[in-house]
Amino acid sequence: MSYLDGLQQCVDSLQISIGTLSSSIDTLESGIHDFPRIKHILKVQRHFNLISEDELSARQAKFEEIVKPILSKAFQRLEDSISSLQRQEDSLKTKYELQEARLDMLKNRPATSAFSVTTESSEQLKAIIAKRQKLVYTLERYTLQLQQKRGH
């Protein structure tokens, strides 16, 4: 009976191995049931090309060669525009002060018999006042534009 006992032990061992394999298959199956999705996720797709550091440095240098002159020209034009507006502002301030001085001089001039206010001189005075107001408005507008450009 020892022969049958040996066979029985082999059968028992085989059944234990089958049980272990079945549980291993169940464990693996639960682990790979999502395998198609994982396969799709792990699929190699290049969203970004990998380049060497030397190539990156070369491309950055080339980019700088292209962009720096453009930016320099733009900044120069901006500085020229600002200086032009500054000159216009200074010119308008000077013109305003001159007109204001002339107007004050006309207002402060004593009324004499030699200087009689005629309709022509009153019209000139009105024209000067209107021109002065226009210059004040223009000066304020240029000042605001200059402040906006400096602010940005």
Swiss-Prot record:
Keyword DNA damage: no
GO CC list: cytoplasm; DASH complex; spindle microtubule
Record's keyword terms, sorted: Cell cycle, Cell division, Centromere, Chromosome, Chromosome partition, Cytoplasm, Cytoskeleton, Kinetochore, Microtubule, Mitosis, Nucleus
Localization, UniProt: Nucleus; Cytoplasm, Cytoskeleton, Spindle; Chromosome, Centromere, Kinetochore; Cytoplasm, Cytoskeleton
UniProt xrefs under InterPro entries: DASH_Spc19 (IPR013251)
Statement: the UniProt record of this protein carries the keyword Cytoplasm: yes
GO BP, sorted A to Z: attachment of spindle microtubules to kinetochore; cell division; mitotic sister chromatid biorientation; protein transport along microtubule to mitotic spindle pole body; spindle attachment to meiosis I kinetochore
Membership in a protein family: Belongs to the DASH complex SPC19 family.
Protein function: Component of the DASH complex that connects microtubules with kinetochores and couples microtubule depolymerisation to chromosome movement; it is involved in retrieving kinetochores to the spindle poles before their re-orientation on the spindle in early mitosis and allows microtubule depolymerization to pull chromosomes apart and resist detachment during anaphase.
Subunit-structure text: Component of the DASH complex consisting of ask1, dad1, dad2, dad3, dad4, dam1, duo1, dad5, spc19 and spc34, with a stoichiometry of one copy of each subunit per complex. Multiple DASH complexes oligomerize to form a ring that encircles spindle microtubules and organizes the rod-like NDC80 complexes of the outer kinetochore. DASH complex oligomerization strengthens microtubule attachments. On cytoplasmic microtubules, DASH complexes appear to form patches instead of rings.
Protein name per Swiss-Prot or TrEMBL: DASH complex subunit spc19
Organism: Schizosaccharomyces pombe (strain 972 / ATCC 24843)
